[in-house]
Amino acid sequence: MAIPKIVLFYQFTPLADPEAIKLWQHSLAESNNLTGRIIVSPHGINATVGGDIEDVKRYVRGTRGYEPFRTADIKWSDGLGNDFPRLSVKARSEIVTFGAPDELKVDENGVVGGGVHLAPKELHELVDSRGDDVVFFDGRNAFEAEIGRFRDAVVPDVATTRDFVDELDSGKYDHLKGKAVVTYCTGGVRCEVLSSLMRSRGFDEVYQLDGGIVRYGETFGDRGLWDGSLYVFDKRMNIEFSSEAKTLGVCVDCGTPTPRYRNRIDGDGRTLELLCESCSPDLEQD
């Protein structure tokens, strides 16, 4: 019986030949019948792939067999079996598109000059000891935070990751430079870059949630500082860490609380919107 699983991971490490790594990763994933997205750059790898559990395990073993990726933190979750339409493996200038490839420096230990990594329990210790001096800073697109976020988090008004550089350079967050700023994102990769960009712009005390929201949810579920659902970039669209998850999103049509993002198809194409089951019962999620 097939057991669908999804793995999410990244590794910041210098790669001399991203094109060669791309070809190898495509062959490895394809030979194991996986679908999903893999991005390779001179800075490392960022991947989310899914398939049957045994196929995924073989892919993970093969990937970790390459020394620079040996310590990759693999995050597992349950899949649906058709979570991605195809396999996409690309070589780019960045594994997360902030539009600032020349600002990021990496070595064999990861990002140079990034924020201090905090495990979920260490995050709670920081909040307990520093109180209101700690500020959560969302490293995702603003729409993701509409269905879930850390309590009282700062949510930058960004539509894409590329918007963060201008957002930081605008000066609107300069009042946080004397605070303990904790960046967070889905699995951690965006905050690796964001925290380094913030530090280079004068934010002295910057942290990043190690393993991202995914690892935090695995540790504390809905009994901690996280409220709501987690947006994910596959056909699931959102996941919850327990049956006790709060519903923060609101249907744009009727105002019913909902965590469901769906593609509304109209004359202008597709628009991702919060739509409850009553208002979008039969929308196809391609």
UniProtKB/Swiss-Prot annotation:
Q: What is its EC number?
A: 1.14.-.-
GO:BP terms for this protein? tRNA modification
Q: Give the reactions, separated by semicolons, that this protein catalyses.
A: uridine(34) in tRNA + AH2 + O2 = 5-hydroxyuridine(34) in tRNA + A + H2O
Which InterPro entries does the record associate with it?
Rhodanese-like_dom, Rhodanese-like_dom_sf, Rhodanese_C, TrhO, TRHO_N
Source species, domain of life: Bacteria
The record's listing under SUPFAM superfamilies reads: Rhodanese/Cell cycle control phosphatase (SSF52821)
- Gene3D superfamilies noted in UniProt: 3.30.70.100, Rhodanese-like domain
- Which residues are in the Rhodanese domain? 130-225
GO MF, one example: oxidoreductase activity, acting on paired donors, with incorporation or reduction of molecular oxygen
Instruction: Alphabetically list the UniProt keywords.
Output: Oxidoreductase, tRNA processing
User: Which residue positions are annotated as catalytic?
Assistant: 185 (cysteine persulfide intermediate)
> Which EC class, in a word?
oxidoreductase
Task: Enumerate the HAMAP family for this protein.
Answer: TrhO
Task: Give the function comment from the record.
Answer: Catalyzes oxygen-dependent 5-hydroxyuridine (ho5U) modification at position 34 in tRNAs.
Report the sequence similarity comment from the record.
Belongs to the TrhO family.
* The protein's name: tRNA uridine(34) hydroxylase
